[in-house]
């Protein structure tokens, strides 16, 4: 590890990473849209639920494994599609993927990854998903879908909440310039900003549900819709055949003043009606909140920013440490609540807590 004292929680990982990263890179990762209210709310909202611990239950053997899209994972914490891992460590996504594989979980590879889909697939024997946008360029979309299938990727994540660029004031002050992802064709457009229709491979501001339906029809891989925050949109995802949804407000990076993702999770689960898996990201900094999310109906959760803190502090082993800290805290919470397996965690494990 790069620091003399090893972080013992994810908050300390962030503190250590802040000291190591250039200011503009730290701000890019940590920052959010406008006043960053949703960034903070995502984390704090979990305090609205409290545990109902049960005693005298056999917790001598704890099982943190579960299934996501039919595949077994050893930890109900997946790594979200976040672009540009090399901003935190020279090995970038290669280090992240090796860490995810060694911990038995999934890496969802961002459209803006610094590493090609092919090079990543060779780096470890783990589980990879590919994330993309509703691009204007259907030929490029089909190419990505075909490359994902050919290289053994297990699912497609389609990000739906990025049709218009956000205002991130930290980036404006720092005059931050993003680098192009490794998987775009030479001269292809970055999908960060809307442009006139037909202008290239950007994220399409004119995209509709027909675009998600087209992607679903264009691949045999499971399709997961990311960026859904209402029951109505969960129902529409089901109508076009999505296999899962990720309840996400993009970590508070696109639209400020939304509810926290955990605050809309129950609505999403109810709307899914058991037809799709419901996943969640946003504000995961403790193992205890992973258990709360599962109790509210999530199949599993994703982390985003913490993977960068792990990379910055210790590369591959830093990400392993981040995941293992969450594993340790999940185990403690499960044992203390009398829930020996992920499947034993249900709504009776928590209660809505009155405000302090």
Model-derived regions, located:
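Internal helix-turn-beta structural module
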Residues: 299, 315-343, 350
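A gly/proline- and charged-residue-enriched helix-loop-helix capping module
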Residues: 101-123, 127-141
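Alpha/beta enzyme core
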Residues: 97-98, 119-123, 136-280, 287-309
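Short, basic, glycine/proline-bearing loop/turn elements
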Residues: 78-84, 127-133, 196-198
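C-terminal helical cap(s) of enzyme catalytic domains, especially alpha/beta-barrels
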Residues: 42, 257-268, 311-331
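Glycine-rich active-site/cofactor-binding loop and its immediate structural neighborhood
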Residues: 73-112, 117
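An N-cap/entry alpha-helix motif that binds or orients negatively charged groups
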Residues: 1-73, 168, 175-207, 343-345, ...
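A short, small-residue-rich loop immediately preceding and capping a beta-strand
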Residues: 104-109, 275-282
């Amino acid at each position: 590890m790069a620091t003399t004292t090893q972080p013992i929680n994810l908050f300390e990982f962030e503190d250590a990473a802040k000291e190591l990263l250039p200011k503009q890179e730290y701000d890019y990762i940590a920052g959010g849209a406008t006043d960053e209210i949703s960034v903070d709310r995502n984390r704090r909202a979990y305090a609205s639920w409290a545990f109902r611990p049960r005693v005298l239950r056999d917790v001598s053997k704890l099982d943190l494994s579960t299934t996501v899209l039919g595949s077994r994972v050893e930890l109900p914490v997946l790594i979200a599609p976040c672009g540009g891992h090399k901003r935190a460590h020279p090995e970038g996504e290669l280090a992240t993927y090796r860490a995810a594989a060694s911990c038995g979980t999934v890496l969802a590879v961002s459209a803006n990854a610094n590493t090609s889909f092919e090079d990543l697939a060779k780096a470890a024997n783990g589980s990879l998903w590919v994330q993309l946008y509703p691009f204007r360029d259907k030929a490029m979309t089909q190419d990505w879908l075909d490359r994902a299938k050919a290289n053994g990727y297990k699912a497609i994540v389609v990000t739906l909440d990025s049709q218009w660029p956000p205002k991130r004031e930290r980036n404006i002050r720092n005059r931050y310039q993003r680098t192009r992802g490794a998987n775009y064709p030479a001269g292809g457009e970055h999908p960060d900003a809307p442009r006139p229709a037909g202008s290239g491979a950007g994220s399409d501001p004119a995209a509709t549900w027909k675009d998600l339906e087209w992607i679903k029809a264009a691949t045999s891989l499971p399709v997961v819709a990311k960026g859904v925050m209402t029951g109505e949109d969960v129902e529409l995802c089901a109508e076009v055949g999505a296999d899962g949804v990720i309840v996400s407000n993009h970590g508070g990076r696109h639209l400020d003043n939304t509810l926290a993702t955990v605050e809309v999770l129950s609505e999403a689960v109810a709307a899914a009606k058991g037809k799709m898996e419901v996943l969640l990201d946003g504000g995961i900094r403790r193992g205890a909140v992973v258990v709360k999310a599962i109790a509210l109906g999530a199949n599993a959760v994703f982390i985003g920013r913490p993977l960068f803190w792990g990379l910055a502090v210790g590369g591959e082993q830093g990400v392993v440490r981040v995941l293992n800290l969450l594993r340790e805290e999940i185990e403690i919470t499960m044992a203390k609540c009398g829930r020996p397996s992920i499947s034993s965690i249900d709504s009776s494990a928590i209660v809505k807590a009155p405000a302090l």
